[in-house]
Design a protein with these regions (language model features):
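Intrinsic disorder/low-complexity polar-acidic segments
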Residues: 40, 44, 48-264
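Feature for intrinsically disordered/low-complexity regulatory segments and propeptides
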Residues: 1-49, 53
Length: 264
């Protein structure tokens, strides 16, 4: 606190300091202190732009994905829209163009959807960004992964960012949505073909001991059998991640599942 006070008083002119305050019943609360080059992007502006381009999340192609493939009423319990005093995440899946996955479970086909998610922080804890994911309707898992032509977009909060963030984000989303389903099916089939000889050792190289145990338990619960292949491991990882409360931590784990598909 002393260092912060000294820096604010000595290192910068008061005109260069941006302060974000939130008014409440108990008075004003300091949410963020930023420098002159910082360009704040409001969460409300992002959600408004997404609604304008992609719909309201319940009626367009990109929607809050329904549980187990059913069109359900979006509630606080099943929503894929998250916000806190630090950051925001919006997950939307292309519900109208689902991908049929052969032999998803017990010889039965399943469905997946391509989706995208946007994250932002009004207080400067992270960049504004977008990445793509696959939504598995069998178990409501998310795999943070996309086709090769889609790259994750990260935009720093600078003074000019409000004028350009949407122009960089929208083409990536449209490219992913308009891509063929064959690349998704092939990636899954390739991952299924790679067998894991020692699952415990394989997971231990990537996760802690407790996480590895939880991943194996999640796959056993969801699929009714132990992990045997790279695809099984990805499914177990996302099953474990599904129970992580904070979205930034959950996404970090879901990215690991996507890395397995890339490695297949």
């Amino acid at each position: 606190a002393d260092c912060l006070n000294f820096g604010l008083q000595v290192s910068r002119d008061i005109e260069d300091v941006g302060i974000l305050l939130t008014a409440g019943d108990d008075g004003a609360e300091l949410r963020a202190v930023t420098g002159p080059a910082y360009g704040r992007i409001w969460n409300s502006d992002i959600t408004g732009a997404l609604v304008q381009r992609f719909g309201d999340g319940v009626s367009g192609d990109f929607r809050v994905p329904g549980e187990f493939g059913k069109a359900v009423t979006v509630s606080k319990e099943n929503t894929t829209l998250y916000a806190s005093d630090r950051d925001m995440f919006v997950f939307l899946a292309d519900e109208q163009n689902r991908i049929e996955i052969p032999n998803r479970r017990d010889g039965q086909p399943g469905q997946m959807a391509r989706g995208f998610f946007v994250w932002n922080s009004e207080v400067g804890s992270s960049t504004l960004g977008i990445s793509t994911f696959l939504f598995d309707y069998v178990c409501s898992n998310r795999i943070v992964w996309g086709a090769e032509q889609v790259k994750e977009v990260r935009i720093r909060h600078t003074a000019s960012v409000n004028d350009r963030w949407l122009e960089e984000v929208v083409p990536a989303i449209q490219s992913y949505a308009n891509g063929t389903a064959s690349s998704v099916v092939k990636a899954i089939e390739d991952a299924r073909s790679v067998r894991i000889d020692n699952v415990s050792e394989f997971l231990a190289k990537r996760f802690s001991r407790s996480q590895s145990s939880a991943i194996m338990a999640a796959h056993l619960t969801d699929e009714g059998r132990p992990i045997e292949t790279l695809w099984d491991a990805a499914t177990g990882i996302t099953g474990y991640a599904r129970n992580i409360a904070h979205q930034d931590a959950r996404v970090a784990i879901e990215r690991e599942a996507g890395k397995l598909l890339e490695a297949a």
